[in-house]
Structure formats: structure tokens, C-alpha cells
């Protein structure tokens, strides 16, 4: 499974894909305005997916800037 994360100015969204690229799960949270808050948010999405579906083989991320 693979995790993709999109960090934006107002929301951070994650998607979990199976090996064929089919969506398994999706989670959206508000983007925190601090560095530490943003990192904690990203980790909360990864932990959500891995706690629910098992360890992912990779994580890809996009963010502005």
C-alpha cells in the first residue's frame, strides 16, 4: 500500500492506495499554522492509515513553496 499526502494552506489530505492504485481510504484535516502542528498533522494521517490497514510501503507528499 502507498500513502499520498497533499499539504495545502487550509487542509491536509491523505489517500491510501492499494498496489493497483485503487483508493482504500482517505482522510482530511485542517492544516495547522505552525511547523510542529503541520508535522503532527501529517503523522496523524499516516498513523491513521497504518493503524487501520497495516504498514504502508511508501509515503509521497506534495506541499506548496
Give the residues covered by each predicted segment.
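Short glycine-rich, Thr/Ser-proximal phosphate-binding strand/loop in the N-terminal lobe
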Residues: 2-40, 48
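A generic secondary-structure signal
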Residues: 44-52
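Short beta-strand-loop/turn "lid" adjacent to the catalytic site in phosphate-handling enzymes
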Residues: 51-65
Amino acid at each position: 500500500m502507498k500513502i499520498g499526502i497533499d499539504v495545502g494552506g487550509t487542509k491536509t489530505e491523505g489517500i491510501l492506495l492499494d498496489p493497483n492504485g485503487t483508493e482504500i481510504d482517505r482522510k482530511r484535516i485542517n492544516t495547522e499554522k505552525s511547523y510542529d502542528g503541520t508535522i503532527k498533522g501529517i503523522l496523524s494521517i499516516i498513523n491513521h492509515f497504518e493503524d487501520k490497514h497495516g504498514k504502508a510501503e511508501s509515503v509521497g507528499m506534495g506541499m506548496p513553496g
